[in-house]
Structures are given as structure tokens and as C-alpha cells.
UniProtKB/Swiss-Prot annotation:
Sequence segments annotated as region (Keys region for toxin activity): 31-33
Disulfide bond sites: 3-19, 10-22, 18-42, 24-40
Record localization: Secreted
Record keywords, A-Z: Disulfide bond, Ion channel impairing toxin, Knottin, Neurotoxin, Secreted, Toxin, Voltage-gated sodium channel impairing toxin
KW Hydrolase (keyword) present: no
Organism: Segestria florentina
Biological role stated in the UniProt entry: Insecticidal toxin. It inhibits insect voltage-gated sodium channels (Nav) by partially blocking the channel pore (1 uM inhibits 55.7% sodium current in DUM neurons from the American cockroach), not by acting as a gating modifier. The inhibition is only partially reversible (about 25% recovery) after prolonged washout. In vivo, the toxin causes flaccid paralysis followed by death when injected into Heliothis virescens larvae. It also causes uncoordinated movements followed by full paralysis to sheep blowflies (Lucilia cuprina).
Name of the protein in its database record: Mu-segestritoxin-Sf1a
InterPro entries: Insecticidal_knottin-like_sf, Toxin_28
Amino acid sequence: KECMTDGTVCYIHNHNDCCGSCLCSNGPIARPWEMMVGNCMCGPKA
């Protein structure tokens, strides 16, 4: 299965498809909300 390259927006339903990690700017507490609204991007493995 192909993974999503760095810089691809990742959401709750596909955040595990990033080649690296799904990175969100405002830390873990806001993460589910940020993933829902599309504020997270695939980036290097954390």
C-alpha cells in the first residue's frame, strides 16, 4: 500500500497512511480537532 508523502494533509481517517508521522501544530490535546479540520500534515517520523 502506498504511503502519503511529507507535506500531504492527514486526517483522522488516514493519519496512519503517512510515510512518516502525521504532524499537527498545536500539540496532542488539540490533535483530534486539528486532524478533523485538516491542520495536520505528514512529516518525518517522530
